[in-house]
Amino acid sequence: MSEVKIMLGNEAIARGAFEAGVKVSAAYPGTPSTEISENIVKYPEIYAEWSPNEKVAMEVAIGASISGVRAMASMKHVGVNVASDPLYTISYSGVNGGLVLVAADDPGLYSSQNEQDTRCVARAAMVPVLEPSDSQEAKDFMKYAFDLSEKYDTPIIVRTTTRLSHSQGPVTLEERCEPVDAVYERNPAKYVMMPGNAKLRHVYVEKRLKDMAADACDMSINKVEMNDTKIGFITSGIAYQYVKEACPNASVLKLGLVHPLPRKLIEEFASKVETLYIFEELEPVFEEQIKSWGIKCIGKEIFTVQGEYSANMIRKAVLKEDLELKAAAQVPARPPILCPGCPHRSVYSVLNKLKIHAAGDIGCYTLGAVAPLSVVDTTVCMGASISTLHGMEKAKGKDYIKNWVAVIGDSTFMHTGINSLMNMVYNQGTGTVMILDNSTTGMTGHQDHAATGKTLMGEEVPAINIFHLCKSLGIKNVVEVNAFDIVELERIVKEEVAKDEVSVIITKSPCVLLKGNKFTTKCVPVPEKCVKCGMCLKPGCPALTKNADGTISIDQTMCNGCGLCKNLCKLGAIETVEV
């Protein structure tokens, strides 16, 4: 009897990769995709790695595929932008061993800077897309994706969303298959994409998509559920669950292959229902194609292009139900905030004091944009802080940049910050870059990277030394400082921003949540010395609260003894005690 387990969608994807016989997996962590690799590494049959960025991860998977084995890359939707260069080209080349890219979209922007739809990228790249609707399908579709990849000589994208990635469901486990490795044969016409070869491969790719679209009508992953024919829905992925919840008796065409679309199947389904609704999260990808075929349907006229969908959306827009209005629960506000003891808070308290603006980047330190720290002024994408600062200096001059810095984390610096810093040096820029080194990829759950000295598979390896790396670029002014030494940090910041050349400040202190961090002190208030000035409250540490009489309390269950509040108080109204 097969074993059944309750699995997250991401966990099921990892299981599907295992059962499909995958041998190589590469990724860069990014919510909501991170747990895929964290679960894949549990299977010793699969080599798994954290790559410096998604482009590298995609290329690692491509290399493994060309050599003849089944390989995959996984990333969040904005990571697909970084990986798009190799993705677009490998679509032309095709594969040898099966090749799958898992892309996790984020409707509702729970942890992302935009709400892009990976299906749009896939259409431009001419890469087929599968979209599972629950954990069981997440596992099964992974296996099916590798079969399709090898059958049609194409990379395949498996598209997930935050809700699927982080929802649980029953999954029937099966044994791992061990496909015979494909034999590699030298074939420059297929694998060397210079213009002459690429022109011929483009013709092949167009034919491949047409063939696949024709075959899609008979694919088992596209399912027709004929019930009441007054209402019909075409949907896919997690949105299917909302349709079944709101309209259990409606007819439904659930698409498992969401690009290319099975035109004949869609036309047949549409002809059998009175009113056809297209229910798809984010962009009107289905709707635009279906309407272009002359099929009457209703989509974004009543459904939004923004945010997550829900069963209530259907009840209101389709069934015209008056939903019961309920008062929102009265709960305390929980704005995003840096953790107690976070070294970034110490850095930002200094920048705030000096009235220095920061070009920001992607990571926990993005929270430096919100009050009371209010330091970060811009955030675009991974690695953009340094390039943005450089652009400001070239536009406004050296004097303008004296009260600006770029802030970037150690993992993000490894991701795409190095090229930006190199550009700054090469093009004779001026400006101060602060690398906030907390020895981890903190925002996505403490994954290792090239500068930590440990791989995803737990191997101890030489760590990239960020200080020496910056020096090797020809930067004369590279300084390391303890993030919590605010006196020294303030002195260094003043000194470096005044220089008419590139300088780098590396603030070093491990993330407070890292395993193995041991805290031997706590901070306690001394009320009789307090003059109620509020200096200790300025960094916004959640462990500190203001009492009715103006003195402060420190929650000992939250305090990590970092000492920032103590260092800010010049009157000795906060002390540290051993614990």
Region locations from a protein language model:
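A glycine-rich helix N-cap at a beta->alpha junction
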Residues: 45-52, 93-104, 184-187, 426-439, ...
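Thiamine diphosphate
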Residues: 1-135, 226-227, 285-287, 292-506, 512, 516-517
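Flexible, low-complexity linker and terminal segments
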Residues: 2-10, 132-338, 343, 356, ...
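Short acidic, glycine/serine/threonine-rich loops at helix termini
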Residues: 36-39, 62, 83-87, 109-116, ...
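Conserved thiamine diphosphate
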Residues: 106-155, 161, 196, 336, ...
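Short helix-loop-beta junction
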Residues: 39-45, 243-253, 468-474
